[in-house]
Amino acid sequence: MVVENRLEKEKPAVGMETTVFVHGLPRKEAIELFRKAKKISEEMGFQLAVVGVLKGKIILGMNEDELTIMMNEGSEKIGTREIPIALAKGMNAATTVSATIFLCKRFGIDVVVTGGTGGVHPGGVDISQDLTEMASSRIILVSSGIKSILDVDATFEMLETLEIPVVGFMTDEFPLFFSRKSGKKVKRVENVEEILRIYRTMEELKLEKTLMVLNPVPEEHEVPREEIEHLLENIELKVEGKDVTPYLLRKLVEITGGRTLKANLSLLEENVKLAGKIALALGR
């Protein structure tokens, strides 16, 4: 196994998946987001550890050129299950939330950031590896909830069944990616210090679960849940498996005239800031 860890040991770091850049956004916006996230990390004083696999090598702290190579040459979207296969076969692979959590935990990064996590898809057969990884890795994950295309009720119940702690940052509503409200209630935290107390308590208990910190999309960029659900009802699904989420997200961008893309970029930027604050506080 070849690993290139570019992180400074004593400096706080935030892990970030490569799938959001390579499969989740149009190329232009993906590169702009990467540059913004890097700038935020430099200004705040933490390290942005974009995690991916390039030609079978794990890289912690990917740069813009490497992301561009992955976009140009193509890269498979991988969860935890596929990591050993991608490494052994020398593949280019973009990590999802599950693979990112696994690799960050393996190499000492305590905070991971994403836009929206996976969950249970309608029908109940397709269940994301994100959930099972969160159920077995103690780490802090900052997100804007689960992706709006999922079965919300089933995913919410699965989070409880898998004993995954969930808190809302300055909200008691479980957000749904583009939408601030789901009708599902969560425990509210007011500040980063509360998040740290919960995480430290998890460490004391040796509770090997991910602390899911939910940061709703900024209000000015929200696309309400009802609108998203109505739009999804009219999209004909022409793919299956791992291609479902990127396909539906692209379709929503088209149908909404880019509103969901603006929401996605906005929430990702805010999540990077919150994750950075948490990482810096953890490092003190």
From Swiss-Prot:
Reactions listed under catalytic activity: D-ribose 5-phosphate + uracil = psi-UMP + H2O
Cofactor info, note text: Binds 1 Mn(2+) ion per subunit.
Classification via Pfam families: Indigoidine_A
Sequence positions that bind Mn(2+): D126
Record bears the keyword Heme: no
Protein name: Pseudouridine-5'-phosphate glycosidase
One MF term in the entry's GO annotations: pseudouridylate synthase activity
